UniProtKB/Swiss-Prot annotation:
NCBIfam families named among the record's database cross-references: PRK11509.1
Signal peptide boundaries: none
Phylogenetic classification of the source organism: Bacteria, Pseudomonadati, Pseudomonadota, Gammaproteobacteria, Enterobacterales
Known function: Not known. Could form, along with HyaD, a complex involved in the processing of the hydrogenase 1 structural operon.
Protein name in UniProt: Hydrogenase-1 operon protein HyaE
Domain of life, per lineage: Bacteria
Family (UniProt): Belongs to the HupG/HyaE family.
């Protein structure tokens, strides 16, 4: 992929981080190798500029949860749509979260830092019963 479009440049930056490209047809295989993982789904940065911020935010977010052996997969524009369809995701950027090979949920869009941490905590930490 050349750097002809904003997404091409973003794609190259994500590859430079060592993140794994994944397709909808290979996602299940990837999850067997990376049971604690996130999959970054994107859209055209010209249409949705916050897509360019998502890799930075997610990279930092994963450091806040060191009890997991996080792996990161990335999907190109076409595969983002296919994977998004599979998981009912229609708002991008989106990050699918898996722990122990199980789908835990999705982080859609960009959020303030404290809110993002709380959203992720709700996905990955065991639910504790609360007294009513």
């Amino acid at each position: 992929m050349s750097n002809d479009t904003p997404f091409d440049a973003l794609w190259q930056r994500m590859l430079a981080r060592g993140w794994t490209p994944v397709s909808e047809s290979r996602l299940d295989d990837w999850l067997t190798q990376a049971p604690d993982g996130v999959v970054l789904l994107s859209s055209d940065p010209k249409r949705t500029p916050e897509v360019s911020d998502n890799p930075v935010m997610i990279g930092e977010l994963l450091r806040e949860f060191p009890d997991y052996t996080w792996q990161v997969a990335i999907a190109d524009l076409e595969q983002s749509e296919a994977i998004g369809d599979r998981f009912g995701v229609f708002r991008f950027p989106a990050t699918l979260v898996f722990t122990g090979g199980n789908y835990r949920g999705v982080l859609n869009g960009i959020h303030p830092w404290a809110e993002l941490i709380n959203l992720m905590r709700g996905l990955v930490e065991p639910q504790q019963e609360r007294a009513s």
